[in-house]
């Protein structure tokens, strides 16, 4: 079954390169495309898996709403690299995220993946390039062209040296003598990737 795509200008065929959203595996990449509507407004296309190692449908067959949160994160990181020129080596640190599903029935998992689109506004609060990029993405979630949620993410991107200063040395003993955990397995995990 092929769904009618309400945004013909967007591609949904394959994910973008995983390095552009700081993911280790292609299966973790949901964003497929983005188009600029105006200076700070974008449409970001995504394809959500019907099931996933981290995101499972609930017993009633609705997609995990955390897919929306991860799509916002990936959309912001992708736009930062592809449209704003934030270097690929920069680390992202999330500072605030909020999201709300307004019409959960639109998240029903069907025979074919839905056309997921973020109608997104990108702003740059606290921006101080080239070493620190303050970014915020506010998005309306559209599933098959119908609005069904809204959310936003604030983060900043910084170079490796400043990131290490902020986070401290990995593996340094904590106050109780145990080594501090590696935040993200050494690859920039957490909300910002």
Please report, for each region that a protein language model flagged, where it lies by residue:
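Non-catalytic linker/capping segments at the edges of enzyme domains
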Residues: 1-60, 156-193
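Active-site helix/loop of acyl-thioester processing domains in fatty-acid/polyketide metabolism
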Residues: 63-89
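Short, low-complexity, polar/charged sequence segments that are solvent-exposed and flexible
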Residues: 62-66, 118-120, 170-174
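Mixed-charge, glycine-accented linear interaction segment located at domain edges/termini
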Residues: 126-174
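Hydrophobic beta-sheet segments that form the core/acyl-binding groove
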Residues: 97-146
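A short glycine/small-residue-enriched secondary-structure motif
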Residues: 44-50, 88-99
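Hydrophobic residues on conserved beta-strands that form the core of alpha/beta folds
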Residues: 31-32, 94-96, 148-150
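A generic structural signal for short, non-catalytic loop/turn and secondary-structure boundary residues
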Residues: 37-39, 90-94, 146
